[in-house]
């Protein structure tokens, strides 16, 4: 709740924090907890089903043709889980550094290096050990005075107390009528939060207009490998990126 109300963090992170969970949960929740939460995949959560992350040989989602809310469309082999953190994309756009203390002492972990690809028997999606604790997260400035414009966008089924089906955060550094620098991160579409270099390339160095935002959305789904039950997320990604880019551009 303090992050959602703080003027010290970018508006995109405030928006993401304000939409997470419920007011009661936000009062008790932490940024580190949101980043390190485990997947919501039903096969992982229910021990009556096999799960690669629990040490079984298969990921049932791969063969399940039903619509999947908690599965991704990128990097979804051998495990198709989607990372549920609602604040991770916004933190990613700020070139964050995660500060950790553990049995080996203190260390700083670049945000992009925090994440670990799924492995058989590995429950965590981060490189942190069981004894590690996130003490704080350091964000690079995204000041409007320096030309930065940021936005967060997510698509979900319910307006409150729900996880996003797809989320996107955007940071644009604007010079004149063009984007000089861009950072586009996606959530809920892969086992870890991912950065979309293709969407960034569609924006940087080009005059901005409504078509440019749509082009970024199209570029964002390049390389996707959706399963039968997650193809719908392709369009959600296109829409979320287009909305986030347009929203960021409209801010000064």
What is the meaning of each model-derived region?
Residues 1-252:
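C-terminal structural segment of proteins
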């Amino acid at each position: 709740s303090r992050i959602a109300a703080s003027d010290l963090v970018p508006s995109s992170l405030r928006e993401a924090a304000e939409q997470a969970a419920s007011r009661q949960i936000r009062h008790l929740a932490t940024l580190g907890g949101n980043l390190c939460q485990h997947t919501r995949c039903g096969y992982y959560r229910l021990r009556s089903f096999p799960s690669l992350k629990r040490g079984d040989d298969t990921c049932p989602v791969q063969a399940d043709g039903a619509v999947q809310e908690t599965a991704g469309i990128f990097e979804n082999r051998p495990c198709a889980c989607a990372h549920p953190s609602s604040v991770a994309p916004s933190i990613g756009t700020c070139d964050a550094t995660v500060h950790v203390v553990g049995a080996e002492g203190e260390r700083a972990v670049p945000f992009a290096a925090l994440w670990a690809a799924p492995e058989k028997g590995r429950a965590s999606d981060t490189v942190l050990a069981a004894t590690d604790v996130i003490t704080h997260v350091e964000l690079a400035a995204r000041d409007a005075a320096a030309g930065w414009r940021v936005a967060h966008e997510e698509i979900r089924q319910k307006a409150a107390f729900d996880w996003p089906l797809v989320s996107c955060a955007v940071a644009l550094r604007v010079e004149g009528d063009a984007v000089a620098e861009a950072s586009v991160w996606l959530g809920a579409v892969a086992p870890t939060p991912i950065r979309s270099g293709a969407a960034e390339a569609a924006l940087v160095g080009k005059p901005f207009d409504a078509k440019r935002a749509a082009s970024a959305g199209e570029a964002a789904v390049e390389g996707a490998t959706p399963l039968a039950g997650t193809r719908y997320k392709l369009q959600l990604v296109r829409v979320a990126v287009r909305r986030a880019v347009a929203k960021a551009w409209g801010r000064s």
